[in-house]
Amino acid sequence: MNKKPIIAIPMGDPAGIGPEITVGALNKKELYDVANPVVIGHGDMLEKMLPVMKADLTINRITTVDEAMFEYGTIDVIHLDNLNVAEVKMGTVQAQCGKAAFEYIRHAVQLANDKKVDALATTPINKESLKAAEVPYIGHTEMLADLTKTEDPLTMFEVHSMRIFFLTRHLSLKDAIDQMTKERVHDYLLRCDKALEKLGVKERRFAVAGLNPHSGENGLFGREEMDEITPGIELAKKDGINAVGPVPADSVFHHALNGRYDAVLSLYHDQGHIAAKMTDFERTISITNGLPFLRTSVDHGTAFDIAGKGIASTVSMEECIKLAAKYAPHFVTA
């Protein structure tokens, strides 16, 4: 019996690089050694990308996961007939593409909710195309949260052996600092610990990054560490969380990459993003925690400027599928 996890891959915005990186990734036999991938998309669009990606593959249009072959050389696609492929102009914002991209995701979510697939590995969508289609979301995370009735999903990056969580995300630095309260640090460490537990990570050693130079150096360069961050860490430790810090941001990610910590809690968006993407831009993969299913995602956009040219790297998509396959057997929904 084939026990490899079934990974659903929504095709993304048809006018972006989603279809071609999907084809390119599934042209790698090693992916089929660890996963059973099934695409949710439009078979004609994938077929159009075969010569672009120089892929000698067959497109198997299906209506249910049970019909999938899960064999290298064949791309199984749950074909949604929701797109006029002849009118798709690569690299442009189009309402039909935004609508189709949303419908691929919605279908994948339903499959996950029905336990037909073990995880989602998502490809890029475009905010402007969604808006043109009057789809009321700005991105995947908000969409998935609403479709699953999940409040405040938690984002984690993984690159090589390093995991990074984010205390704040899309805020100005000034506003992010205002959010760095001891209560928030405490709450997020509890949530991060639960997230890793759900992924099957047994040992969970956390480091919290510092905000100021040298983590403030006892108030010499700022009091945020003394007044908020350290007290928040201490509250988490009282609840049994294995956490240290604040550790100066110029060294904490280096130590995590070398195995001293199992995860870092980054305080603001760019602090963690820079660390991850300087380590390996293409292999930085996002995991959305807090959903009722496992979801991994490439951490790049639709790349309209190169879409349809066959030059987009497939490395991130490959890593996205591999990471979903890595964690899916251990993922706990409760």
From Swiss-Prot:
Instruction: Quote the record's binding site residues for a divalent metal cation.
Output: H170, H214, H269
Q: Reaction(s) catalyzed by this protein? A: 4-O-phospho-D-threonate + NAD(+) = dihydroxyacetone phosphate + CO2 + NADH
Q: Which Pfam families match?
A: PdxA
* Name of the top EC class for this enzyme: oxidoreductase
* EC number(s) reported in the record: 1.1.1.408
Question: Domain of life of the organism in this record?
Answer: Bacteria
Q: Which residues take part in binding substrate?
A: H140, T141, K277, R295
**InterPro entries attached here?**
PdxA_fam
GO molecular function list = metal ion binding; NAD binding; oxidoreductase activity
Q: Look up keyword Zinc-finger and say if it applies.
A: no
- SUPFAM superfamilies annotated for this entry? Isocitrate/Isopropylmalate dehydrogenase-like
| Cofactor(s) listed in the protein's UniProt record | a divalent metal cation
> What's noted on cofactor binding?
Binds 1 divalent metal cation per subunit.
**Keywords, A to Z?**
Carbohydrate metabolism, Metal-binding, NAD, Oxidoreductase
What does the function comment of this entry state? Catalyzes the NAD-dependent oxidation and subsequent decarboxylation of D-threonate 4-phosphate to produce dihydroxyacetone phosphate (DHAP).
**Self-association or partners: how does it assemble?**
Homodimer.
| Family affiliation | Belongs to the PdxA family. PdxA2 subfamily.
- The protein depicted here goes by the name Putative D-threonate 4-phosphate dehydrogenase
Source organism of this protein record: Halalkalibacterium halodurans (strain ATCC BAA-125 / DSM 18197 / FERM 7344 / JCM 9153 / C-125)
Gene expressing this chain: pdxA
